[in-house]
Amino acid sequence: TAIMVSNHGGRQLDGSRAPFDQLAEIVDAVGDKVDVICDGGIRRGTHVLKALAAGAKACSGGRLYLYALAAAGQDGVEKSLANFHEEIERAMKLMGVRSLSELGRDQLKYR
């Protein structure tokens, strides 16, 4: 069982808190009973790592791929996915983690 934390691209609830800003609270509230998927604002590999570090089990996003598809078709999507993957790998190396399971809230700095 899982729940999706989303603001629907900001077009439904434009005044609500961003999914990431409330992610840790939601993860704490549901505990191990429900997996939490973060959706909304996921446009870079580092966004995925931040969400996973905050406790999400997965991330979802569509704009990144849709923009690439509209701009350059299948080649654009393939390049976008490759860049996304490279961003995740590079950020993990910079953070000193070898596995996603090593991510945790202690690696996040909230403003």
How does the language model describe each region?
Residues 21-111:
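Alpha/beta catalytic cores of nucleotide-metabolism and tRNA/nucleoside-modifying enzymes
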Residues 1-26, 30, 71:
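Glycine/Thr-rich beta-alpha phosphate-binding loop at enzyme active sites
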